[in-house]
């Protein structure tokens, strides 16, 4: 092979049409080579892989964190409990008001205030559970982004060719 990239083959002159150097997007040791010299490869074929144990573990960790966040965001236990509490509080307050209407001052003002406070507290618990759900959904979105980033980093450990050709 001549220094200008040409090779002489018994009566024929072969010239390289495209000579490409393909760089890895991450630093590291090559752990796997997917071709042999002289082999034809298609565009976007994976030529080699860099050692990626740490990147793979980051993807697994991010997947677990994402799954956990999705589970938290989809849980409605807190909201259901708050709604049940509100239903009970409203029923108790309504019974006390009915009793006071039927028999004047049968329920003390202090008890009526306590029942109203309990009802208001239950309403606030519903608002709080809704806010918690919104925050949990944002957390799930954040974890999804972290998973995507970890997967992108892992993908950068694969060295692919932009063109078809012979290696």
PLM features: what roles do these ranges have?
Residues 2-6:
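Hydrophobic alpha-helix/coiled-coil detector that fires on Leu/Ile/Phe-packed helical surfaces
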Residues 115-123:
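Short amphipathic alpha-helical coiled-coil/interface segments
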Residues 154-157:
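Long, amphipathic, non-transmembrane alpha-helical coiled-coil-like segments
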Residues 9-11, 15-37, 42-47, 161-167:
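Short, solvent-exposed beta-edge and connector elements
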Residues 17-20, 124-131, 152:
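A glycine-/polar-enriched beta->alpha junction
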Residues 29, 120, 138-141:
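General helical structural elements
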